[in-house]
């Protein structure tokens, strides 16, 4: 599905949320828009509300107030949320939350079966998706016996097999070894996928995203820091640097400003392998 109207695929507007049993709000009027072609990196400290925001986007949590729109329609009931989930794929931070079938092939074919493909078509699509991620020969393997990194890639395969328009990826590099991490970067860039990625891996974000936002004090704002890849050798390879920008964190209004660096400020290297 391709949106040719210029309207956002996904809009979260003025989202407020507090977890039951707590008094401190996690989100205090957060606004986030994802349009076709956007490649957004979502930054923020642990507990800032990044994952909560994506869970609300997918209908896994309900906000106290604010609205979620999918292609200009309010996503508020099972029918509208089902349409959203067919269009937008979500990778959980913990792969065990996503995988529940005995074998890898069954896990990856589960989504296509739910979309109405025949068992044969679903198996074929699952096999092709696994091959595209470098997971040839994984189909018959028992899912719960995989390593953490292997589970993460199989979980991604289960999302990609549904051929979504956009991706929401929560810490996709967790548990990945360097070679698999690079393969994921290559896959995302080859797909030119519309996505939002949560990650503390600055180098990964610099290589896969073009716009950077921060969740801070319950709102989404233009990022104070921008990851940049510099092609010089540092401990054996290229590294990402963060460039602090001038000013405070300004609340994000749904428009995107592609990040540039500010050479008037010092920068520090940060590796996150």
From Swiss-Prot:
It comes from Nitratidesulfovibrio vulgaris (strain ATCC 29579 / DSM 644 / CCUG 34227 / NCIMB 8303 / VKM B-1760 / Hildenborough) (Desulfovibrio vulgaris). Probably part of an ABC transporter complex. Responsible for energy coupling to the transport system. Its EC number is 7.-.-.-. The keyword Repressor does not apply. This is Putative ABC transporter ATP-binding protein DVU_1056. Keywords: ATP-binding, Cell inner membrane, Cell membrane, Membrane, Nucleotide-binding, Translocase, Transport. GO terms for molecular function: ATP binding; ATP hydrolysis activity; ATPase-coupled transmembrane transporter activity. It is found in: Cell inner membrane. Residues 10-242 form the ABC transporter domain. ATP binds at residues 44-51. Its main location: membrane. Residues 234-273 are annotated as: Disordered. It is an enzyme of class 7 (translocase).
